[in-house]
Design a protein with these regions (language model features):
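Conserved RNA-binding domains used in RNP assembly and mRNA/RNA metabolism
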Residues: 2-111
Length: 111
């Protein structure tokens, strides 16, 4: 079963993320990104950005985001193209977070 879902929120934002669990009040996600649509040279291009600042700063993979389902106006199973871009974006954010952590450690604790 695919645990990655795409939602349109009441705010107009479009997000994608990995569903971990749900209860009667919230949906619990990790790795939530916004999907932004742009038209460049008559082609549709999607960019993905971190929805919550700092969610990729922990290497222990424990940042969980609770989403109130009453704020969701529509849902979708992402296309293969969107899924591939999502996976690449997540890899980038995780790698970038590791680089930032290493740089910060060097600044705080020089060799």
């Amino acid at each position: 079963m695919n645990s990655i879902y795409q939602y349109k929120l009441a705010t107009g934002e479009e997000i994608i993320g990995e569903l971990l669990e749900e209860d009667e009040d919230f949906l619990y996600y990790k790795n939530v990104l916004t999907i932004n649509r742009m038209i460049i040279d008559n082609s549709i291009v999607h960019t993905m950005n971190s929805w919550i600042t700092g969610q990729f700063s922990d290497n222990d993979d424990t940042t969980i985001i609770a989403i109130n389902p009453s704020h969701i106006t529509s849902s979708n199973i992402p296309t293969e193209n969107i899924l591939n871009q999502y996976r690449k974006s997540i890899s980038y954010y995780v790698q970038d977070s590791d680089l930032q952590d290493n740089q910060l450690n060097l600044l705080l604790c020089p060799p």
